[in-house]
């Protein structure tokens, strides 16, 4: 084949994989040039055959692993792909397609390579790599520069090591060689771990690989991972994998019937027949129960947006098509947007409680028609928000642009919003200090995810008590992303001439100059936590000291050494006063006038969860601008 024809073939070969690729997160690739091939060599032909096999429509995307060989020695090529155990077949396929495209561009002449992505790994070599343990291609990463507090470091390292090694034992014994683990570190911090081997390894080789990878991880940080070409391990203090998927995968099998053995007696008339009937009956019972469980699971996963069903979506499968719901279904669920179903109203529209025909309850937000945003932009933003998967964010289930309206459908929160309890004298007593402190930590976790842990940096811009919803267990979830802005990878600040949000919560630089950043969210967080501590709205202070807002009042009490006078009388006698004062201190750091002096959310979270972190002296606050 001529070089020109070869180039044309390669071009079409590459472009054939790019159509369906979306949202693949590249990590690293390794392709040593110790052995290479020429453009016209048999090895390239075999490599193309191998990659075509791995990316075929019928490849094993549902299991997340496939291996293949092509050609004869010395030009034989062996390869495999391994997708992360919690991703969907669609995401697996996209990642494999992307990696194949990347491989032929980044390693155009190397005879071996390994490509790592967050969602998958692709590997090929001129040596046999199947069912063979390999420690090459190692890559180690820590989660930024955030370290666990020095006094707790050894205990944390032991905790992570023990938890991850337990997961390694489970993974090595499982058919898919994959396992996730979730363990409580503190009242506000949960450890999430994931370990995985290529399924062609033996149990012992898988455990040896994972054990080595865990030893290499920087266990003194708040997160870390090790990637080998045969296995990988990762831990974080946030949920980085799809909990819903792994919960289903790792669910224990149904309990077997009583283990009492059947006793056979000598052949008496009718006895043998009765025993056989009994055995068949038991087996059929077990099979029917198993089939019902499988059918129920499949039904829950495959429910579509039809007039008879509620939406059900998995984070990795989210597309515009999967999110779009039938307007008539939503209208019926809200009883034609009945006033009796209305549960709230804000600047961007009305909120209704909806109940689908299968009993699923949802919150339906009917957006006002004043927005100038086009349908395409609206759909794109909906998909972005829907992909934000965190336990402290309200989950967006779908949308509709039917009937001349724009509608958002969220998961339903039975306990309404934080302000419903916090500012009602009759309900305040349901929020003791323990519960309030838990709410504060949950809000911090949600903002931290938006600012740092999600793939996009997102500024909420409207953090306030009414936008913190509470689930059945009073866990907080951030809601209402109508004003949220997405920042680019290197972007730290943005200006706007359109000041939107809620006065009293807005950082001064935003309210006055239109400048917003992660630090403007930090300011709003500080005001919100002061409200949680005091039980009073930020704009309802008309005290004897002349303060007309909560920040001014808190600053004056702090300066006078009487910070505890800020605390809600309902909780003052049943709280850890040192803990409350520390929270007030953190709030005052958040509302400092100079945005550069305000801590970022990861630092704030460390301050909240570790009493050994020294807090700096707060400087003059930026007093809120009132409407």
UniProtKB/Swiss-Prot annotation:
Glycans are attached at residues 33, 58, 101, 145, 242. Its main location: membrane. Pfam families: PK_Tyr_Ser-Thr, Stress-antifung. GO terms for molecular function: ATP binding; protein serine kinase activity; protein serine/threonine kinase activity. Keywords: ATP-binding, Glycoprotein, Kinase, Membrane, Nucleotide-binding, Phosphoprotein, Receptor, Repeat, Serine/threonine-protein kinase, Signal, Transferase, Transmembrane, Transmembrane helix. Residues 21-276 are extracellular. The modification Phosphothreonine is found at residue 502. This is Cysteine-rich receptor-like protein kinase 15. It comes from Arabidopsis thaliana (Mouse-ear cress).
């Amino acid at each position: 084949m001529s070089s020109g024809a070869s180039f044309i073939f390669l071009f079409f070969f590459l472009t054939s994989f790019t159509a369906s690729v979306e949202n693949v997160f590249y990590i690293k690739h390794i392709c040593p040039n110790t052995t290479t091939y020429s453009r016209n060599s048999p090895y390239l032909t075999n490599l193309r055959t191998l990659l075509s096999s791995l990316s075929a429509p019928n490849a094993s995307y549902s299991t997340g692993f496939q291996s293949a060989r092509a050609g004869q020695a010395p030009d034989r090529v062996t390869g495999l792909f391994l997708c992360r155990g919690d991703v969907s077949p669609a995401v697996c396929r996209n990642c494999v397609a992307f990696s194949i495209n990347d491989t032929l561009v980044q390693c155009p002449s190397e005879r071996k390579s390994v490509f790592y992505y967050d969602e998958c790994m692709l590997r090929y070599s001129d040596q046999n790599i199947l069912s063979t343990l390999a420690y090459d291609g190692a890559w180690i990463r820590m989660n930024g520069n955030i370290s666990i507090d020095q006094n707790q470091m050894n205990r944390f390292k032991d905790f992570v090591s023990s938890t991850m090694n337990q997961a390694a034992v489970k993974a090595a014994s499982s058919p898919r060689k994959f396992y996730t683990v979730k363990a409580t570190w503190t009242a506000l911090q949960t450890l999430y771990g994931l370990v995985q081997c290529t399924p062609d390894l033996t149990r012992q080789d898988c455990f040896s690989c994972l054990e080595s990878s865990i030893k290499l991880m920087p266990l003194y940080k708040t997160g870390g991972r090790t990637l080998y070409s045969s296995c990988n391990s990762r831990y974080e203090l946030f949920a980085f994998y799809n909990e819903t998927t792994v919960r289903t995968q790792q669910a224990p099998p149904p309990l077997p019937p009583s283990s009492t053995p059947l006793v056979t007696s000598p052949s008496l008339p009718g006895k043998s027949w009765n025993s056989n009937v009994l055995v068949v009956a038991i087996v059929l019972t077990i099979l029917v129960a198993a089939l019902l469980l499988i059918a129920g699971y499949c039904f829950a996963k495959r429910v579509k947006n039809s007039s008879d069903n509620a939406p059900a979506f998995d984070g990795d499968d989210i597309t515009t098509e999967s999110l779009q719901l039938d307007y008539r279904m939503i209208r019926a669920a809200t009883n034609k947007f009945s006033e009796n179903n209305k549960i709230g109203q804000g600047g961007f529209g009305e909120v209704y409680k909806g109940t689908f025909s299968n009993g699923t309850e949802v919150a339906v937000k009917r957006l006002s028609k004043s927005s100038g945003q086009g349908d395409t932009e609206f759909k794109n933003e909906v998909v972005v928000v829907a992909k934000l998967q965190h336990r402290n964010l309200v989950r967006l289930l779908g949308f509709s642009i039917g009937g001349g309206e724009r509608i958002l459908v969220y998961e339903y929160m039975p306990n309404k919003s934080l302000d419903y309890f916090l500012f009602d004298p009759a309900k305040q007593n349901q929020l003791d200090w323990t519960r309030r402190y838990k709410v504060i930590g949950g809000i911090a976790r949600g903002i931290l995810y938006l600012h740092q842990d999600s793939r996009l940096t997102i500024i909420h811009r409207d953090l306030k008590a009414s936008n913190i919803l509470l689930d059945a267990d009073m866990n907080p979830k951030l809601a209402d992303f109508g004003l949220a802005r997405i920042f680019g990878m290197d972007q730290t600040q943005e200006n706007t001439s359109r000041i939107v949000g809620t006065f009293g919560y807005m950082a001064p630089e935003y309210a006055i100059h239109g400048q917003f950043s992660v630090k403007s969210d930090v300011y709003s967080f500080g005001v919100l936590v002061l409200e949680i501590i005091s039980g009073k709205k930020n704009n309802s202070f008309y005290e004897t000291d002349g303060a007309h807002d909560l920040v001014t009042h808190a600053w004056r009490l702090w300066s006078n050494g009487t910070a505890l006078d800020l605390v809600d009388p309902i909780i003052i006698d049943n709280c850890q006063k040192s803990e409350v004062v520390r929270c007030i201190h953190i709030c005052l750091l958040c509302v400092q006038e100079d945005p550069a002096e305000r801590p970022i959310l990861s630092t704030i979270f460390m301050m909240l969860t570790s009493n050994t972190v020294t807090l700096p002296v707060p400087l003059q606050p930026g007093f809120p601008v009132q409407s």
